[in-house]
Amino acid sequence: VTGHKDPTPEEMEEALSKAKEDWVEARDRDEAIGIFLKAAAVAMDRGVFFVVKGPVVSVWTGFPEAVDEALKGVEIKLSEAPAIKGVIEGKNTYKGIGPASEGVFQDFYKGLGTAEAPKEVIICPVLINEQVISVFFGDNQPSGRSIKAQGYLGTLSRKLCMSLEVLILKKKIMEM
């Protein structure tokens, strides 16, 4: 549920609890990522999930649905995205002003439904075996709210990592 008000601690706890239950039952990575995005939507107006592919990140999915459809498959070179590159290299969350609305980001922001860079974004890494495999990019530009759920999104990101690691282990068990 994408909202235009800050979520209460109870709403975030309820979404996290539901996500944890769902991750235990997740059958594949798409389902695990969908669970993450649904829980992230409690605190964020928009979100995009990128997959790291060497020197580029590629949009995998996002919310709301219009963003997902507009951006699916869009690639951004890390050399043109210092904030995303910094998250990948440092394995830390970034919270701050959105990358400048020029070059590849101009098209990216149009896909998000805006012409200018968001005043504030959050970019969270998703790690498996200490390697960043993907990043979540979220903002509240439509409502103009500041991002106050950094801890919540970090917890979601860590739980997603665990869920993906369990899925990898299940696959290895079946292959042996």
Language model regions located:
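Short hydrophobic beta-strand micro-motif common in sensory/regulatory domains
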Residues: K119-L127
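Allosteric cytosolic regulatory segments
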Residues: G154-C161
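Short hydrophobic/glycine-rich mini-motifs in sensory/regulatory modules
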Residues: V126-F136
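Regulatory loop-to-helix N-cap segments in sensory/regulatory domains
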Residues: N140-G154, L167, K171-M176
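Amphipathic alpha-helical coiled-coil segments that mediate homodimerization
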Residues: A15-W23, D28-M44, F49, L160
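Signal-transmission linkers at sensory-effector interfaces
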Residues: V1-D22
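Regulatory sensory and allosteric helical modules in signal-transduction proteins
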Residues: D68-D107, I173
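GAF sensory/regulatory domain recognition
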Residues: F49-L71
